[in-house]
C-alpha cells in the first residue's frame, strides 16, 4: 500500500506536500484560535508538518493518517525533531474511510480530498470523526482563471475544467452542503513555486543517483515537461486554499 512512485520520488524532499508555506500554516494555526489540548485528525497527513508545528506552537494533540510509507516515516522523524512525539502520532494506512475512535475538535483533509472522491465526500467522511460544533478543514484547489479550453485544463494536469470550481463556486458549494465558512487561508504563487519547482531538483538528483532504475525513463519524461507545463498553464490557472467549516 503506497502512493504512486512518481510522487514518492518527486516530493521526497518536501516537508509540505501542497502549495502552502510554513508561514501559511502558521497563519492558519493562529486564526483557528486553538486551545492547548485541541484534538485533531488529519487525513492525508503527508510528512506531518501541520500537526507537528501546531503541536509545538499551540499545544494540540493529533493523529495523522497517510498511505505513503516514506512520508509517514518523515512525519515521525519531524515529530521527534520538534519534541512533540508524545502529542502527535502518525499511522501508515489508507485514509479513505478512516474514522477516529474518539471524536475530534478539528478534522482535516488538506489537499487529499481525492481519498473520498472530492471535497463533498471528504466532508461526509470527516463529519464522522468530528465533535458537534467542531471545525472541519478542507484543503482544495480551485480555478483562479478558468481555462479557455478543455485542452488547457488537461495541460494543467486535470481531465476537465469541471474537476474544480472557481473560488466563489467552491465557497458556494460549502454553503450548499450546510456549512458556514468561518475562516480561509489561500496559497499564493510563491507557495505554488515552492511546491512545484522543488520537485524538479529532487527528480534531477534522483536521476543522477539512479540512472539504471526501471523507473528512470518515467522520471526523465516528467522532468522534461514539468517546468514548462507549470509556468505555461498551472501557475496562472490554479489557486489553492484551506477552508475552515462549521456545520449549521
UniProtKB/Swiss-Prot annotation:
Which InterPro entries does the UniProt entry name for this protein?
Methyltranfer_dom, Pre_MeTrfase_YjhP, SAM-dependent_MTases_sf
Transmembrane among the record's keywords?
yes
Return one GO MF term: methyltransferase activity
Q: Which SUPFAM superfamilies match?
A: S-adenosyl-L-methionine-dependent methyltransferases (SSF53335)
Which Pfam families does the UniProt entry name for this protein?
Answer: Methyltransf_31
Q: What is its main location?
A: membrane
User: What Gene3D superfamilies does the annotation carry?
Assistant: Vaccinia Virus protein VP39 (3.40.50.150)
* Membrane topology note: Single-pass membrane protein
* Subcellular localization(s) per the UniProt record: Membrane
Keywords in alphabetical order:
Membrane, Transmembrane, Transmembrane helix
Q: Which GO terms describe its cellular component?
A: membrane
Q: Where are the transmembrane segments?
A: 104-122
| Database matches in PANTHER family | METHYLTRANSFERASE (PTHR43464), SAM-DEPENDENT METHYLTRANSFERASE (PTHR43464:SF3)
Which protein is depicted?
Uncharacterized protein YjhP
- Please name the source species: Escherichia coli (strain K12)
Name of the encoding gene: yjhP
Amino acid at each position: 500500500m503506497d502512493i504512486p512512485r512518481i510522487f514518492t520520488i518527486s516530493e521526497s524532499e518536501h516537508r509540505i506536500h501542497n502549495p502552502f508555506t510554513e508561514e501559511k500554516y502558521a497563519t492558519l494555526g493562529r486564526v483557528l484560535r486553538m486551545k492547548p489540548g485541541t484534538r485533531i485528525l488529519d487525513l492525508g497527513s503527508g510528512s506531518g508538518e501541520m500537526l507537528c508545528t501546531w503541536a509545538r506552537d499551540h499545544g494540540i494533540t493529533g493523529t495523522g493518517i497517510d498511505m505513503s510509507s516514506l512520508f509517514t516515516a518523515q512525519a515521525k522523524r519531524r515529530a521527534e525533531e520538534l519534541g512533540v512525539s508524545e502529542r502527535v502520532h502518525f499511522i501508515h494506512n489508507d485514509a479513505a474511510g478512516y474514522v477516529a475512535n474518539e471524536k475530534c475538535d478539528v478534522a482535516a483533509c488538506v489537499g487529499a480530498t481525492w481519498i473520498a472522491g472530492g471535497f463533498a465526500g471528504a466532508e461526509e467522511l470527516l463529519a464522522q470523526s468530528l465533535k458537534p460544533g467542531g471545525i472541519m478543514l478542507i484543503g482544495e484547489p480551485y480555478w483562479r482563471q478558468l481555462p479557455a479550453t478543455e485542452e488547457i485544463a488537461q495541460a494543467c494536469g486535470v481531465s476537465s475544467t469541471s474537476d474544480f470550481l472557481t473560488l466563489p463556486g467552491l465557497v458556494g458549494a460549502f454553503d450548499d452542503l450546510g456549512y458556514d465558512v468561518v475562516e480561509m487561508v489561500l496559497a499564493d504563487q510563491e507557495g505554488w513555486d515552492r511546491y512545484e519547482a522543488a520537485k524538479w531538483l529532487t527528480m534531477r538528483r534522483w536521476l543522477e543517483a539512479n540512472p539504471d532504475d526501471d523507473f528512470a525513463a518515467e522520471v526523465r519524461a516528467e522532468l522534461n515537461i514539468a517546468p514548462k507545463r507549470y509556468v505555461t498553464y498551472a501557475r496562472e490557472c490554479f489557486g489553492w486554499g484551506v477552508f475552515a467549516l462549521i456545520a449549521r
